[in-house]
Curated annotation (Swiss-Prot):
Organism: Geobacillus thermodenitrificans (strain NG80-2)
InterPro entries listed in its UniProt record: Alpha/beta_knot_MTases, RlmH-like, tRNA_m1G_MTases_N
Keyword S-adenosyl-L-methionine found: yes
A Pfam family that the UniProt record links to this protein: SPOUT_MTase
GO molecular function: rRNA (pseudouridine-N3-)-methyltransferase activity
GO CC aspect terms: cytoplasm
Signal peptide per UniProt: none
Top enzyme class: transferase
Protein name as annotated: Ribosomal RNA large subunit methyltransferase H
EC number(s) reported in the record: 2.1.1.177
Catalysis: reaction(s): pseudouridine(1915) in 23S rRNA + S-adenosyl-L-methionine = N(3)-methylpseudouridine(1915) in 23S rRNA + S-adenosyl-L-homocysteine + H(+)
The keyword DNA repair is assigned to this record: no
Function, as annotated: Specifically methylates the pseudouridine at position 1915 (m3Psi1915) in 23S rRNA.
Length: 159
């Protein structure tokens, strides 16, 4: 399975970079992992709704340009479906079973994902009704993917 995480913005915090590197290394035993970063847009302090939509659209165009046409796309969005770790593991296993060898998780910038990205997504996933920093979301997602592989293989880790 080839799993990509397409995200807006570069990681800046050393602890996040170290965490992403650690889970990417751990996951290499289970799948090919790729992190795709696209440039984020500066959001003016008092941006209008129109300006925010235009920013999301520009970031979305960059994301869409990096997504293979044959990939199964999972958008991380607050309005997505929430799953337990076990349900998430079962979903990844199901995708692999049905030949979805390319899975792309998409993480938007601070304003979220554009309508175009959401339209391209095959499904939307939410980790919580709470809002998380988009940079931290990468690390949380990688940990849950790692946990899912461990669950699916019956390996110790998940408690």
């Amino acid at each position: 399975m080839h799993i990509s995480i397409a995200a807006v913005g570069k990681l800046k915090e050393k602890y996040l970079i170290a965490g992403v590197q650690e889970y990417t290394k751990r996951l290499s035993a289970y799948a090919k992992i790729e992190i795709i970063e696209v440039a984020d847009e500066k959001t003016p302090e008092r941006a209008s709704e129109l300006e925010e939509e235009q920013i999301k659209q520009r970031e979305g165009e960059r994301l869409l340009a990096k997504i293979p046409h044959d990939a199964h796309v999972i958008a991380l969005a607050i309005e997505g479906k929430m799953k337990s770790s076990e349900q998430f593991a079962a979903r990844l296993d199901e995708l692999a079973t049905y030949g979805k060898s390319k899975v792309v998780f998409v993480i938007g910038g601070s304003l979220g994902l554009s309508k175009q990205v959401m339209a391209r997504a095959d499904e939307a996933l939410s980790f919580s009704k709470m809002t998380f920093p988009h940079q931290l979301m990468r690390l949380i997602l990688l940990e849950q993917i790692y946990r899912a592989f461990r669950i699916n293989r019956g390996e110790p880790y998940h408690k």
